[in-house]
Amino acid sequence: MDKLELTIDGYKCFERKSEFNLNNITLFTGANSAGKSSVVQSLLLAKITSETIVEDVDLGIVPISLMNKKYSMELGNYDDIINRQTKTGDIDFSLSGIDYYIKGEKNDDVAKNTVVFSITPEMKNKLKNLFSNGFTYLCAERMAPHYEYQESEFNDICDCHGSNVGDVFSRYLGDDIIGSRSLNFTKGTKLLMQLDEWCNYIFPGIAVRVEKTGSQMYKLKMRNDVAPNVGFGITYALPILVSGLTIPEGGMLIVENPEAHLHAKAQSNMGYFLARMAAAGVRVIIETHSEHIVNGIRRMIVEGKTEMSHEDMTIYFFQNKNGEKDIIEITMDEFGNLSDFPEDFFDQIRQDTLAIIRTNRDRKEQENEKR
């Protein structure tokens, strides 16, 4: 799978042009409020633009609402997304050579929370085609445990909160998944069977069932227990598993905080799962604060059970340094070694351990001085 080159200029914290190469699997990690979510939002704006474009739009002028419920985006208005230091007042994006941008001049003909994207007719068709193989975005605020799920208008894919996962699962449970997404073939390749296998891999002893209780209602069951007996971790993870197993080859899966409510081993195994989906031809993009997610991905690639190469993973580490945004691209070699370990890149355990050692050493020295 070829990399997608994303460039951002003038959007939020991106005062100057910044480039990102979206690999088979790409991870955004690092400090809070350093730009990770803004990169994801740039992709969502591209997707929304591709959905809004229609053939009779003249001159490629596309009004886009910055308050988008489908993708759980509440960006405010133009003044909230423009970088105040940009000289032109424009916000420029490019995705795989497809340029789409927001002009800086005020337009009184559009609503307060709406901006106007400009894109040429040729580029608008390319943008449509770019997302034609499937697109799923799972935001950090996924569903909480509850008994039943209501059928959604977007019932062929999980919505951004995963609230319709029961319906999506029910729709595809008898379908075959792509073989390389199977954990193993002992139970066959049907979605229901493979979801059982992956659930048991991440949450030993857990199996998932969906029971239809009405024309638009489904009840989620885990083994023989009704859904509220299931913890947050499984509930948060289920939309990721179903989406990964059902999205078409060549599609894009964006997941925020896949580690939410999972213990360390489950986080690592979730990373392993996402890497397996990437190896099967899904472009996976992850925003995470978990070193266990990263290490699970590294483990899957190094094991060599798929054709996925170490060159198919890229990590972007975001930090605020001396009041400025700093982004470091980190790659991996064939042995799983990372190209860079900047300060604060998953080294908090080491920092805390050293702090404890120093504190205890100083305490002993003080006690000895008192004797």
What is the predicted role of each segment?
Residues 1-49:
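Pre-Walker A-like glycine/lysine-rich segment at the N-terminus of P-loop NTPase domains
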Residues 2, 269-371:
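C-terminal lobe/lid and adjacent interdomain/linker elements of RecA-like ASCE P-loop ATPase modules
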Residues 17-23, 245-249, 276-278:
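Phosphate-binding P-loop
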Residues 5-7, 49-243, 248-249, 321, ...:
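Phosphate-coordinating catalytic segments in nucleotide- and nucleic-acid-processing enzymes
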Residues 11-13, 27, 33-34, 142-145, ...:
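Short, solvent-exposed loop/turn segments at secondary-structure junctions
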Residues 255-258:
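Walker B catalytic motif
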